[in-house]
Amino acid sequence: LWVRINNAWIGAANGACWDVQGVAALHARGWYLVSSNHQSWVDILVLQRIFHGRIPFLKFFLKQELIWVPVIGLAWWALDFPFMKRGKGQGAQQNDLRTTREACEKFKLIPTTVINFVEGTRFTAAKHAAQQSPYRHLLKPKIGGLGTALAAMGEQFEALLDVQVMDGQAYRV
């Protein structure tokens, strides 16, 4: 129901060009790891729309502060999305690593799609310049979450789906 409501909303509000390829062999009874860039909050709705019914329900790791976003914070909590503290220091990193491992143990129980935004944050021109990223349209990747998911569930994943959200106008899978 949650995804259907989001799909209806994005379908009514968005006249984007969708370039979706390589999804014919996917199925809703498997486990998938999705790697995607991250331009805006709309990316999540886009991913839900293009994968709905093709792969299992999408799960992603959220900053703890997002639990306080009206309505959707409660929805994410009720849907058992993992919330990360993302603090500085060894203790905070260990807590996030433990949260990631615990979430992956739950994900093993029923078909799930784990999404990892490898840039770790939304793309902006200022962040791109500050990082001196060698990529034209991407920030430097952070592979910690991806590596942890692979270490915990690697053999269970049927495929790694590489998604590129482009220009906020066209979406390509």
Residue spans for each PLM region:
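Soluble catalytic domains of membrane acyltransferases
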Residues: W9-R172
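N-terminal alpha-helical membrane-insertion module
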Residues: L1-A8
